[in-house]
Amino acid sequence: MSWRKDQDERLDGDEGDEELDENDYKTQKDAVLFAIDVSKSMLKPPQNTGDKKADKDSALTAALTCAYQIMQQRIISQPKDMMGVLLFGTEKSKFRDDSGNGTGYPHCYLLSDLDIPGAEDVKKLKALIEDGDDEDEIMVPSKEPVIMSNMLFCANQVFTTNAANFGSRRLFIVTDNDDPHAGDKQAKSSAAVRAKDLYDLGVVIELFPISREDKKFDLSKFYDDIIYRNPAAEAGQSESPKTSKSGDGLTLLNSLISNINSKQTPKRSYFSNLPFELAPGLTISIKGYMPLNRQTPTRSCYVYEGEEQAQVVQSETAQVDFAARTVEKSELRKGYKFGGEHICFKPEELAELKQMGKKTLRIIGFKKRSKIPSWASVKKSIFIFPSEEQYVGSTRVFSALWQKLLKDDKVGIAWFVARENAHPVMVAIFPSGNPDDEEANTPYLPAGLWLYPLPFADDVRSVDHVTAPPRPADELTDQMRQVIQNLQLPKAMYDPRKYPNPSLQWHYKILQAKALDEETPDAMDDVTLPKYRQIDKRVGGYLAEWKEMLAKKANDLQNTRAFKREFEEDDERPAKRAKPSKKAASGGGGPANSNADLKKAFEQGTLGKMTVAELKDIMASKGISTAGRKAELVERLEQWVEENL
């Protein structure tokens, strides 16, 4: 019998039945095959312009480096996904190890078969890029023109045999040739047929074109007939491939990686075809997405190394009673503890208890956007977009609602049930502007509507009243305003794409170094660390002035409070005079009745001559603890005088 923490969590709360299964949403398997063109133009290095930021590697090297870096990321962060590299236009041909000379797919070289990337695959690709280890003369362009239908048919076979049941299969084509079959209509027609076969198979073709200064990539010549647009794709989103330019200030590698990363993770809906009721009799269908989700390191697992090949240990869970007898599932009942007793339910009763109506998103009213406080969020927001699959015209109605909410600066209040047995949630429907709209302040988020979960009355906790902090002087505020204005982020906005999680990246780098037998990095690259030199250069003088002003204000405030305490103590002194002690009558040092006397006694060192009773009376009047022996009382009183007088 083995035990897993997540098993106990499911047994305790059964939350998996009540919430959308986000783990399934995140871990759908994906298969990506890179198809990289090997031609003379792809092998040609860019001209040396003397610019340090200009490209130095050929387009082919940049494409292979991009595939290498993506493979490095996936080998750890997405261990269930498959990836492969196919070179086309090569002089040599190779399909698989057992397929002879690859005559079935001429000028196609399967460099890395579509599979879960292993350390050896990454090392092989790294040697080809960094060391220039091309002993097999793989990167030699063919003398004959490439036949694109052969490459597409080869990719078809790779996906069919290696990733037949994958939910997402994609072919990434990297090339600088916009018309591989110029003047050959038969070859173009054959390639279009093969592309249609891939589309029918469920494979999405993504093109990453490379243009040069003297030649712009023209999609209409060939690739418009190869790349199939998804008819059910979200309206309003451009699906045109982004062109990477070689030879300009922005390196080709960075451009390729940016374009590929934008399509690296396929769009997976969090829920699909959810009825969205805007009014009685007016319903459209929507899809939900989770654009923002906190990434955590992959879970560790137990590995058995007793055999030739290490194997992941398969865990099993069993329920036992007090006598260590295994309890069958039919003997178990689910229940809740109530009033010291366990209230048990049958499965059908429990299902009925969870039934809160059909899945829906129903608007119940509207409010000004300013009426929704920033703290009223209990979960992460869900991005919704229209779907035409169930209700034709959903896009137009959805767009009208979005534009109206933006125009009037309002939000919708809605009742949200994600699925049949899910808990209902009250949500605010927030509109987001276009990414290129500066007033929207969301250049990295899509335009549309967001479901912003709101708390119920049961979710609001009572908090003890906290007094507001004292208001600082206006001079301090004005001086600090200059500091803040000079330390603002670009465009006064936080862009999460520029700040990778340092702990997550460090975790992956260590695993990568172990897997690839590389040197362990000395320190992690943390871009969240403050740039102290730049901060000092910008606001060092302002901060020094502010600190001097703060010290002056604090000193003035301390003197004012000390004078006020002394004035109040003198006013509150009783009219009846206490009988002087013998020591006072004889001219000895009596107790200090005022702050001035107390300070004088401290300077003369006569506090220790007071009795314990006198010390306690003075300390009690000052709010100082009177516990301890005489030496402790004297020391505590001297410290108070030194700090306050």
Swiss-Prot record:
Cellular component annotations (GO), alphabetically ordered: chromosome, subtelomeric region; chromosome, telomeric repeat region; Ku70:Ku80 complex; pericentric heterochromatin; site of double-strand break
EC assignment: 3.6.4.12
Predominant subcellular localization, coarse grouping: nucleus
Record-linked SMART domains: Ku78 (SM00559), SAP (SM00513)
UniProt-listed CDD domains: KU70, vWA_ku
GO annotation (BP), single: stalled replication fork localization to nuclear periphery
A GO MF term: damaged DNA binding
Domain of life: Eukaryota
Tagged with keyword rRNA-binding: no
Localization (cell): Nucleus; Chromosome, Telomere
Ranges of Acidic residues composition bias in the record: 11-22
Protein role: Single-stranded DNA-dependent ATP-dependent helicase. Involved in non-homologous end joining (NHEJ) DNA double strand break repair. DNA-binding is sequence-independent but has a high affinity to nicks in double-stranded DNA and to the ends of duplex DNA. Binds to naturally occurring chromosomal ends, and therefore provides chromosomal end protection. Required also for telomere recombination to repair telomeric ends in the absence of telomerase. ku70, of the ku70/ku80 heterodimer, binds to the stem loop of tlc1, the RNA component of telomerase. Involved in telomere maintenance.
Name of the protein in question: ATP-dependent DNA helicase II subunit 1
